[in-house]
Amino acid sequence: MDHIRNIAIIAHVDHGKTTLVDCLLKQSGTFRANQAISNEERIMDSMDLEREKGITIRAKNAAFKYKDYHINIVDTPGHADFGGEVERIMNMIDGVLLVVDATDGPQAQTRFVLRKALEAGAKPIVVINKIDRENANPHRVLDEVFDLFVSLHATDEQLDFPTVYTSAKEGYAKIDIKVPSTDMSLLFDAIVKYIPAPRAHAGVEFKMLVANLDYSDYLGRIAFGKIYSGKVKIGDAAACLHGDGRKTEGKITAIFHFEGLKRIEITEAHAGDVVGVAGFEDVFIGETITDNITRQPLPFVPIDPPTIQMQFAVNDGPLAGLDGKLVTARHIWERLTKEIRTNVALRISQTDAPNIFNVCGRGEMQIAILVEQMRREGHEVLVSRPEVIYQKDPEGKLLEPIEKLFLEIPKEAMGVAMENLSGRKADIVHMDHHGNEVTIEALIPMRGLIGFETDLVNMTRGLGVMSHLFHEYGPDRGEIVARKNGSLVSMEDGEAMSYALNMVQERGRLMVEPGEKIYKGMIVGENARENDIPVNPCKAKRLTNMRSQGDGKGIQLDPPLRMSLERALEYIGPDEYVEATPKHLRLRKKILDENQRKRAAQSRAPKAVLA
């Protein structure tokens, strides 16, 4: 047990966390020098989406050997929508590597994960990365990191953190920035020296806290976590102590640990190690696996509650089934059920309508990632606008989720940001100026956060950073105006014609190009005014045997407005859907027929309350 180290790596997007892990795995000999690492860099980001978006979504494990030590690494997601992942990881580790860019310094998302780590009592090592960059300023960054620790109420012991200067790209680490170095051995030594051995007891009964789940078609659910005490062998009788008080008896059918990124099957495991065990089909994150049904469960950090819900519906549009193979309600429900086996922060439920399902999560990004994964797997699905989950207090008053928002923005963007926040009913709690940056802390309703990330990118030209945590359920703060513009809605089925689109674009911005398939009820553009207008984008120019004066003049169409999935989900109104298929993203009305839409609007009931 003294030769095991469990560490997490914390870093802001693009500060080189994943590259650093690649470097550690290569230099520790986990990958042979001539072995191709899946022919691409960034080994830890194994999901396609993670590579594309440059973010870590799922917490993943890796491990390497250094001298006699077995070092387990857990990669932490930095995005606050995946906060559920971060909190669980903290139970497994004893120390953290805080990776900070030598030019940019610590950012808002680093703060979110670091706070959780310090609260859990983890021992930090600060790694100042990318010191090979021309404009690197490691000394200033070190001062900023120290200030960050102080502002997060770190203990005196945590404030006395060791610092290692690295270039993960070039593959070297230094303790003294002036002394040349050729490899990462100083960082390996620091991990072994400063990070304590796991908090665990060797001699007593076997207990393990489940922090992550995986699924295998042969073994069923595999529960990953740290062994807090005792040891376990394949074939041992075991018990699972569930969160709701139930207890299930079973048998350990397989044990895994990590070497590099591979899961290696082993026959027994001891206290302090991070392993996966199979044998319990209905085990869930936060539950305890132990050797006997009479044992007490281990304490568990509760995960932030879901605060947002969306509806997933079967694609019933005229173009359904042209792109995707998996289009029925059964396919969607099976995929959602599979997702919640491993994704703890999601909840799913069926509704009164057989082809509509509710999906609740921590934020729109998290649910958008799920929709994007489903598209790639061949699903077609309709997704509604995110709605917040309300609660009622004992007196029957409405309570809505309030989030704590952390913003880091350039000084010149402060005015527009404050104006935007006040329109979203945010209360500014704290503001801090440092150099050309401003850090803002605010309490904002979850409704106000929907669509804020896109606004932030526009207001700060991509330089703003945000993260948010669940704060409390508070009184309803009144109406927030979401979108001021109405939609241009097609009243015909057919193909978009440039002649017709030329007339439609006088009313607002187009979202389609000539030649695209269109159907009744599909949104083809954004109206310049607040109301919806039915338009006919499929009208062809009548041919006559008389030439008019305008003949031969080319029609000039503005480039259409194209949206990413996240942006589309924020953009649509409450009576609209995003139609996500493997090849297309379309916006449409929930009710396609115009007359039925008008009737529904007249008889629309007041806003439903989620108890």
Regions found by a protein language model. Name each.
Residues M1-A611:
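Structural and coupling elements of P-loop NTPases
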